[in-house]
C-alpha cells in the first residue's frame, strides 16, 4: 500500500488548519484625539470576533508605566477615578472620560483576553487642545 497519499493529505490538512487560525483583531479609534480640560471624550475598540466581556482598558504614562483602568468591559479598577467608565454595544467597546483632567492626557489601549494570544488595539493618544 502506498503511504504517500495519506501523508500528503495530512500535510495539506495541517496547512489548511494553520491557515485558518485567526487572531482576534482589535480596531481602536481614534488614533489621536485633541480635547480640552473638562471635556467628555469616548474611545472605541471594535473586536473582529466575539470576546464577550473580556476587555480591559489601559492607560500608559509617558515614562511607560501602564495602569489598568477598566476590566471585564465596565468594572472600574480600585483607585481609578469615577470619571472613567467602560461600556459595550455589540462588538464595540468604549472608554468614556466624563470630564478631562490634566493627568488624563496620555495614551490609552484596549486589550482583549478572551482568546490567546491576547491582542491590543492600536492605541489612542489623547492630547490637550491648544
From Swiss-Prot:
Residues 1-22 form the signal peptide. Transmembrane segments: none annotated. Disulfide bonds join 45-110. Keywords: Adaptive immunity, Bence-Jones protein, Disulfide bond, Immunity, Immunoglobulin, Signal. One of its GO terms (biological process) is adaptive immune response. Residues 57-71 are annotated as: Framework-2. Residues 79-110 are annotated as: Framework-3. Residues 72-78 are annotated as: Complementarity-determining-2. Residues 46-56 are annotated as: Complementarity-determining-1. Residues 111-119 are annotated as: Complementarity-determining-3. This is Immunoglobulin kappa chain variable 9-120. InterPro entries: Ig-like_dom (IPR007110), Ig-like_dom_sf (IPR036179), Ig-like_fold (IPR013783), Ig_sub (IPR003599), Ig_V-set (IPR013106), IgV_Light_Chain (IPR050150). Residues 120-129 are annotated as: Framework-4. Residues 23-45 are annotated as: Framework-1. This precursor was synthesized in a cell-free system directed by mRNA isolated from myeloma polysomes. One of its GO terms (cellular component) is immunoglobulin complex.
Amino acid at each position: 500500500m502506498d503511504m504517500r497519499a495519506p501523508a500528503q493529505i495530512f500535510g495539506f490538512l495541517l496547512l489548511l488548519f494553520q491557515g485558518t487560525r485567526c487572531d482576534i483583531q482589535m480596531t481602536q479609534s481614534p488614533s489621536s484625539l485633541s480635547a480640552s480640560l473638562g471635556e467628555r471624550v469616548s474611545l472605541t475598540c471594535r473586536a473582529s470576533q466575539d470576546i464577550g466581556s473580556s476587555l480591559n482598558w489601559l492607560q500608559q504614562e509617558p515614562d511607560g508605566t501602564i495602569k489598568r483602568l477598566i476590566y471585564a468591559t465596565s468594572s472600574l479598577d480600585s483607585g481609578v477615578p469615577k470619571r472613567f467608565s467602560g461600556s459595550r454595544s455589540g462588538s464595540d467597546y468604549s472608554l468614556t472620560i466624563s470630564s478631562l483632567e490634566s493627568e488624563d492626557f496620555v495614551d490609552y489601549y484596549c486589550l482583549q483576553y478572551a482568546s490567546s494570544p491576547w491582542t491590543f488595539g492600536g492605541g489612542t493618544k489623547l492630547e490637550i487642545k491648544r
